[in-house]
Regions:
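N-terminal basic, amphipathic alpha-helical segments
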Residues: 1-118, 122, 127, 138-140, ...
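Hydrophobic residues in beta-strands of the RecA-like P-loop NTPase core, especially within AAA+ ATPase
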Residues: 260-261
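Active-site PLP attachment segment
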Residues: 70, 282-315
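Active-site donor-binding loop signature of nucleotide-sugar glycosyltransferases
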Residues: 77, 98, 208, 230, ...
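Short, well-ordered alpha-helical scaffold segment located
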Residues: 40, 232, 311-312
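Conserved core of the PLP fold type I
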Residues: 125-255, 267-268, 273-281, 285, ...
Length: 361
């Protein structure tokens, strides 16, 4: 097992995680094969056992490997059929909440300081109408944030700003049109089904199992678009495993299929690195990625965004390009500043540390 670690490049555990994961996905490390012991691999690579343990734990969190008594870590990702072994895995449900979230609030002092700074620096510019797709500065800041934290590399033109997920759902439906049948997780956030119903499109309810959309339901559905919240589905708290994510990607590989990926609550992963996005995993440019800042900053902020596949940018422009951006210019510049100066990511890291501490007690 030859892995190359650059100790000058941080974090080291993510280098190891990425290389092992690639071997698993590419079937170099096959289903049920045993990984080296933590101590043996640490000695071979000249790194600490803590580093190896952290990499293995992340692989386990994402469903690529599992820890077995007296056997150590073994590969649980099965490329042949797309499902991780679940025989010895206990799945815990963490129901999500719709109202007041359990995460520490974004510091009001930081928010007010940033607002004053933006007012001072940008003045009358803040009274001007926003470009229809959102301010370029915010779209560029989101682009850089996604590249740093979610493995998503896109052009600024692919990012559209809107006032929350409901607004963006409606625009996605109008863009893709009524010729599609939409598959929705069941149960899911109530307003999702209400939006599809109000839009008068055909949709199916796809039941959830312990690791994402039920296998049989996904294989039998007539839907050509699936709407999924893979990191943490509301209200069940179900998270899609790595195997399930790859299954979704394979499902969408057929012609004229799309995935709408709502990355709800992924920022609050207990692991340092959240689960891979479907947008990053897919190589066929058929995933529409969506997220908001309602949980991470405040529901009253009403700022969301979606990332379009490149080939849909022109379609969006032709069908919906005339719509004005519904987010005030002032709040767009405030969020831009929070993303660019690091305050947003510092808050996320504080929340993660608190969550890890709470889990340990």
């Amino acid at each position: 097992m030859k892995y190359v670690i650059d100790k000058e490049k941080r974090p080291v555990y993510l280098q190891l995680y990425n290389q092992i994961r690639e071997d698993i996905v590419n079937d170099i490390l096959r289903f049920d094969s045993k990984l080296p012991s933590i101590r043996a691999l640490a000695e071979e690579l000249g790194i600490s056992t803590v580093t190896v343990e952290h990499a293995y734990a992340l692989l386990s969190d994402e469903g690529y490997v599992e820890s077995r008594e007296r056997s150590g870590y073994v590969v649980s990702f099965r490329k042949a059929d797309g499902f991780a072994s679940t025989a010895k895995t206990t799945h815990k449900y963490h129901p999500a909440t719709e109202t007041k979230h359990a995460y520490p609030d974004f510091p009001l002092s930081v928010l007010s300081k940033t607002m004053r700074k933006v007012l001072t620096e940008h003045g009358d510019l803040l009274l001007e109408k926003s470009p229809n797709y959102g301010c370029t500065e915010l779209r560029e800041a989101i682009k850089q944030y996604l590249a740093r934290n979610r493995g998503i590399s896109v052009d600024t033109e692919q990012i559209i700003i809107g006032s929350g997920s409901e607004y963006l759902y409606e625009h996605i439906i109008m863009m893709l049109g009524k010729s599609h049948t939409y598959g929705i997780e069941s149960p899911s956030y109530k307003k999702i089904e209400e939006i599809y119903h109000a839009s008068e499109v055909d949709y199916e309810l796809l039941p959830l199992s312990h690791d994402g959309i039920d296998n049989a339901a996904l294989s039998k559905t007539t839907a050509t678009v699936i709407h999924t919240t893979p990191y943490r589905s509301f209200p069940t708290g179900v998270s899609a495993t790595a195997s399930k994510l790859h299954e979704y990607v394979r499902w969408a590989n057929q012609k004229n299929r799309y995935i709408i990926e709502d990355d709800f609550e992924s920022e609050f992963s207990v692991s340092t690195k959240p689960t891979d996005t479907l947008f990053a995993l897919s190589k066929n440019d058929n995933v529409i990625y969506l997220n908001t800042f309602s949980k991470t900053i405040s529901p009253s902020l009403r700022i969301g965004y979606m990332v379009l596949p490149k080939h849909l940018v022109k379609t969006y422009e032709e069908k919906l390009g005339f719509y004005s951006c519904t987010v005030p210019t002032f709040m767009q510049y405030v969020l831009t500043e929070l993303l660019n100066n690091g305050d947003f990511e510092r808050h996320i890291n504080r929340v993660r540390r608190k969550m890890r501490k709470d889990l340990a007690t």
